[in-house]
Amino acid sequence: MKFTIERSHLIKPLQQVSGTLGGRASLPILGNLLLKVEENQLSMTATDLEVELISRVTLEGEFEAGSITVPARKFLDICRGLPDSAVITVLLEGDRIQVRSGRSRFSLATLPASDFPNIEDWQSEVQVSLTQAELRGLIEKTQFSMANQDVRYYLNGMLFEIDGTTLRSVATDGHRMAVAQAQLGADFAQKQIIVPRKGVLELVKLLDAPEQPVVLQIGHSNLRAEVNHFVFTSKLVDGRFPDYRRVLPQHTSKTLQTGCEELRQAFSRAAILSNEKFRGVRVNLADNGMRITANNPEQEEAEELLDVSFEGEPIEIGFNVSYILDVLNTLRCDNVRVSMSDANASALVENVDDDSAMYVVMPIRL
């Protein structure tokens, strides 16, 4: 195996592929990249057995077909350390990879390509296509609500639901929930999959060309996305996601409407003096006035008064201010609507001018 490539063509795909590996590999082979040259294409593959990322780069220089695995971190650091204008030659000699550029020479240990784990061949059951901007939007509007290391393993990820002509993303950690939707160009049978947290966070990094398409292939236990020159595959979480429709407040009797940024800043200031552990703030609503108060064990107090549009009977309700701020930081809209029924029921938060995302926040007792 042999290939020659300009550093500028190699470095970005190499960085993105290596990025999927994260921390220390559980097996030596998982710390390696699979390099494969066939025809005039170099493919680089990394996997941690949960997600797999393949990058394909067209070779313009001379090449010889073959495949081998090399230590990912060392190979990346060598290529990163070479000058921007460098031309890199990679050559397999025996069981060593020679990396050469200008007056620099490196000899790296290898492991056989046959040892590299392959996410098993699988059949795609559904294939959908949408723009990268649409998929990125679905993820960015909801990813903050994913659980992290929850014993309810099915919450440590994101639900994607195909429902007719709609693709939805749903995430919840049991305290708050986010739902977003985008329209598909065709009509599909209903299907739900749970993509693990790591798969979601790695996939969104690849979606950097808003107008370009992304093709999603969904199988029984895998999701594959073809994005630009990458093929991304993630195993799916084998579990049942809670019925998010039952969590959405159905009958609300109190509605607050106000500027999103004004509300965000008021909650941010009140949060400074909230209890560091429980992050509780008290909200009082009556007669188009809103009062936000917070205090902490040091007996320090914060109070914010806002003029708002409010319909319904007066209410006093408590929230974890971090959850409210996560929603408002994600919405970043002009005007926000908050719908409630009583102090013990969840609140529904929405952008007044856009119904493509909904947020549910559970109240807390103060």
Curated annotation (Swiss-Prot):
One GO process term, biological-process aspect: DNA strand elongation involved in DNA replication
InterPro entries associated with the record: DNA_clamp_sf (IPR046938), DNA_polIII_beta (IPR001001), DNA_polIII_beta_C (IPR022635), DNA_polIII_beta_cen (IPR022637), DNA_polIII_beta_N (IPR022634)
GO molecular function ontology, one term from the record: 3'-5' exonuclease activity
CDD domains listed in its UniProt record: beta_clamp
Cited Gene3D superfamilies: 3.70.10.10, DNA Polymerase III, subunit A, domain 2
SUPFAM superfamilies: DNA clamp (SSF55979)
Localisation per UniProt entry: Cytoplasm
UniProt entry keywords in alphabetical sequence: Cytoplasm, DNA replication, DNA-binding, DNA-directed DNA polymerase, Nucleotidyltransferase, Transferase
A single GO cellular-component term on record: DNA polymerase III complex
Main location: cytoplasm
Pfam family, one: DNA_pol3_beta_2
Family: Belongs to the beta sliding clamp family.
Function: Confers DNA tethering and processivity to DNA polymerases and other proteins. Acts as a clamp, forming a ring around DNA (a reaction catalyzed by the clamp-loading complex) which diffuses in an ATP-independent manner freely and bidirectionally along dsDNA. Initially characterized for its ability to contact the catalytic subunit of DNA polymerase III (Pol III), a complex, multichain enzyme responsible for most of the replicative synthesis in bacteria; Pol III exhibits 3'-5' exonuclease proofreading activity.
PANTHER family: BETA SLIDING CLAMP (PTHR30478:SF0), DNA POLYMERASE III SUBUNIT BETA (PTHR30478)
Subunit note: Forms a ring-shaped head-to-tail homodimer around DNA which binds and tethers DNA polymerases and other proteins to the DNA. The DNA replisome complex has a single clamp-loading complex (3 tau and 1 each of delta, delta', psi and chi subunits) which binds 3 Pol III cores (1 core on the leading strand and 2 on the lagging strand) each with a beta sliding clamp dimer. Additional proteins in the replisome are other copies of gamma, psi and chi, Ssb, DNA helicase and RNA primase.
Annotated protein name in UniProt: Beta sliding clamp
Native source species: Vibrio cholerae serotype O1 (strain ATCC 39315 / El Tor Inaba N16961)
Gene name linked to the record: dnaN
